C-alpha cells in the first residue's frame, strides 16, 4: 500500500506550508490525481486523516480531483484519451491496462504518447491564521 508513503509526503508538505504561513488550522487540501497514478483516493484520504489526527490538519477536508489521461501525437493532436472507447473495449482488470490498450490517436489512429494522467499535485491548501476574522 503505497498510499501511506504518498500521504506522508502530502502531510509533510501541507504542514510545512501551514507553518510557513502561520496557520492555526488547515481547513482544506485539494489534490489533482491522475487516473493512471495507481493511487486509491479513499485509501489516501484515510492515511492522510490518520497522520493529521493530532495536528492542526485534524479536521481538514482532503479533496481529490481526478485527472483523465491525455495524449499527444506526431500528427499534432493533443487531448484526452477517449474514455468512451475504453469503457466499450475494457476487458482488463487493471485500469492502466485498459488505457494502455487504446493509446492511439483519435485523429489519425497511430500510437500516441501518454502526456498526462499519472500526476499527483497539491493544487491548494486552505488555512486559517490567528489574524483572520
Curated annotation (Swiss-Prot):
Binding residues annotated for Zn(2+), in chain numbering: 73, 75, 105, 108
UniProt keywords, alphabetically: Metal-binding, Nickel, Zinc
This protein's record includes keyword Metal-binding: yes
Positions that bind Ni(2+): 2
Pfam (any one): HypA
Alphabetized PANTHER family for the sequence: HYDROGENASE MATURATION FACTOR HYPA
Record-given protein name: Hydrogenase maturation factor HypA
Organism of this sequence: Methanosarcina barkeri (strain Fusaro / DSM 804)
Lineage of the organism: Archaea, Methanobacteriati, Methanobacteriota, Stenosarchaea group, Methanomicrobia
Amino acid at each position: 500500500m503505497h498510499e501511506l508513503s504518498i500521504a506522508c509526503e502530502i502531510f509533510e508538505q501541507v504542514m510545512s506550508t501551514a507553518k510557513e504561513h502561520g496557520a492555526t488550522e488547515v481547513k482544506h487540501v485539494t489534490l489533482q490525481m491522475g487516473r493512471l497514478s495507481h493511487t486509491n483516493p479513499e485509501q489516501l484520504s484515510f492515511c492522510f486523516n490518520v497522520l493529521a489526527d493530532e495536528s492542526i490538519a485534524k479536521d481538514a477536508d482532503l479533496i481529490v480531483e481526478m485527472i483523465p489521461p491525455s495524449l499527444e501525437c506526431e500528427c499534432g493532436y493533443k487531448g484526452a484519451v477517449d474514455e468512451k472507447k475504453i469503457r466499450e473495449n475494457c476487458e482488463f482488470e487493471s485500469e492502466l491496462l485498459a488505457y494502455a490498450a487504446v493509446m492511439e490517436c483519435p485523429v489519425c489512429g497511430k500510437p500516441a504518447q501518454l502526456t498526462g494522467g499519472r500526476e499527483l499535485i497539491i493544487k491548494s491548501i486552505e488555512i486559517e491564521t490567528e489574524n483572520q476574522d
